[in-house]
């Protein structure tokens, strides 16, 4: 997975710790301003900030769904597993000495640890794994994140002006990936970029209407 991601972003400059607070326009460019007053200039802006995208407009139909994953320290037997398991939950092969199990679904934006979710993840381990490989759990950890879901469980892309009703200066939105961002994001990003550069979409008009933000408004 890491090699796939690295290949996607090989020509991308990543700027961290830039908490965007405001975007203004001047001379055909968007001025992106952070909380310290630092500025970046961009011809095109794409908002892809998960459930926090609702800060752009109350009309955006995104539902926050928090999820907790559990990390279990691999043992001598489990380290040899070369397969991931999916059974309502998921159980990954070891990465950097830990397996990942998850994830819970809670209809809120709470990122606090929940013992009930931790136990549910651990108890979800299939019996054949528990009996033969994970009969003794020695160490566990966790991570809680928030998914951005839509009412029809499908992502969206489009122009910000479709959402706000106000003309935007090349500002777009891409979101609603839910728990399937790794699958959906590359495809939806390609559709959005194709739209931005006024190229021919690889999908027909009926399918386009089912994928854009307009279907949710």
Residue spans for each PLM region:
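Core beta-strand elements of the Rossmann-like FAD/NAD(P) dinucleotide-binding domain
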Residues: 35-44
């Amino acid at each position: 997975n890491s090699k796939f991601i690295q290949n996607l972003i090989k020509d991308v400059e990543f700027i961290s710790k830039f908490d965007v607070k405001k975007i203004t326009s001047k001379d055909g460019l968007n001025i992106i301003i952070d909380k310290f007053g630092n500025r970046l200039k961009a011809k095109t802006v794409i908002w892809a900030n998960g459930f926090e995208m609702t800060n752009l407009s109350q009309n955006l139909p995104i539902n926050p769904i928090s999820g907790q994953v559990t990390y279990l320290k691999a043992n001598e037997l489990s380290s040899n597993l070369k397969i991931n398991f999916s059974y309502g939950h998921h159980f990954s092969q070891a990465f950097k000495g830990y397996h990942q199990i998850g994830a819970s679904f809670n209809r809120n934006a709470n990122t606090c640890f929940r013992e009930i979710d931790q136990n549910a993840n651990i108890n979800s381990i299939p019996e054949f794994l528990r009996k033969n490989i994970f009969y003794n759990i020695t160490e566990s950890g966790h991570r809680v994140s928030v998914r951005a879901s839509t009412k029809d469980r499908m992502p969206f892309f489009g122009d910000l002006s479709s959402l706000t009703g106000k003309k935007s200066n090349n500002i777009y939105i891409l979101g609603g990936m839910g728990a399937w961002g790794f699958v959906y994001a590359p495809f939806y990003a390609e559709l959005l970029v194709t739209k931005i550069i006024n190229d021919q979409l690889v999908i027909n008009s009926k399918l386009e209407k089912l994928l854009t933000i307009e279907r949710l408004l």
